[in-house]
Amino acid sequence: MREIVHIQAGQCGNQIGTKFWEVISDEHGIDPAGGYVGDSALQLERINVYYNESSSQKYVPRAALVDLEPGTMDSVRSGPFGQLFRPDNFIFGQTGAGNNWAKGHYTEGAELVDSVLDVVRKECEHCDCLQGFQLTHSLGGGTGSGMGTLLISKIREEYPDRIMNTFSVMPSPKVSDTVVEPYNATLSVHQLVENTDETYCIDNEALYDICFRTLKLTTPTYGDLNHLVSATMSGVTTSLRFPGQLNADLRKLAVNMVPFPRLHFFMPGFAPLTARGSQQYRALTVPELTQQMFDAKNMMAACDPRHGRYLTVAAVFRGPMSMKEVDEQMLAIQNKNSSYFVEWIPNNVKVAVCDIPPRGLKMSATFIGNSTAIQELFKRISEQFSAMFRRKAFLHWFTGEGMDEMEFTEAESNMNDLVSEYQQYQDATADEGEEAFEDDEEEVNE
């Protein structure tokens, strides 16, 4: 089977990663000890994508858990699914990265990276046919951002033809942990643009707004935010984990979603978003799901898709529903909002349907959009970056670890280039767009 190796780095990465494993273990009928307690053959049909089967019929996540301090690992280990993971696959330092990208990327992280790569290598050797890697991390801290991007580039060197997929939590002013977040994020995006094939941008600000406005939680905790992230991650990986037709592996998804190699930052969304207590009181219909799924309020990145245009969209519907109805609703949305889809990529909306709904819901829909509006997120980080960098504020923490100011300047201009590339395709009309598309193809053919 087409296996995926999962890596989670840093505090945020480990928290959302562990939640992801809890959710998908539940969906596949795997109990906290790794035993199978499910009731459907579908649960096991593609179980090998994320789990190794041990000789004693135990299912073990194909996961490496990485952090530069022991704290998060301890809480994962003592959590409900702590015994599910292979003990050898916990790799941690003692010092911590102190929210410093340079420590994660160049000093502390660089010392630990080889032992992580050993674990990754071992997991890859157990694979029949490895399709790629997925990393969960945040871009605001030190370990997930600095060491996470270091791991990506090392894995890229060793497995250049495998897909690299990340779930990256972007910093936001509303939920700020550290003052140097804009530095860490800009340096990370600089790496992600070059080294990943698909990046799901998850944004704390958007998650907060969803908890606050839609779920009516007055004081959302990180637990509530992670609950949303895990629902979304479970949704976007559905077609990888259950037998289905469309986007059934990472490469097919990338082919459908990425028209230009640098523009691979996706905006995820999820429906239905109902407060945790009131799920059973809602009867859901396909039109409602479709409507909600495209709603700006349901996006997990704090960008308004109405301020941009969709290059491509993939949607995953889950639950017993009529394929025909789903297709009709999706067409209706495209026709009604045609100005929000670029006209120079025909058929740019793809739909997959999986019969198995997530736990506690009759049906759900997950949205993956490659929208030019994602530039708002990068602009926001860039403005904060420039404000501090102009004054060289806090730079000594980074230069002290051996970094050069030049690197900051490069990262900044790379991110600004990314913003203008998104803008260019947002403004492109059919005639210009097609030319751009052809130019791009010519380069590929050479």
Curated annotation (Swiss-Prot):
Motif interval(s): MREI motif: 1-4
Taxonomy, superkingdom: Eukaryota
Cofactor: Mg(2+)
Organism: Bos taurus
Family designation: Belongs to the tubulin family.
PANTHER family, sorted: TUBULIN
This protein's name: Tubulin beta-6 chain
Description of its domains: The highly acidic C-terminal region may bind cations such as calcium. The MREI motif is common among all beta-tubulin isoforms and may be critical for tubulin autoregulation.
Subcellular localization: Cytoplasm, Cytoskeleton
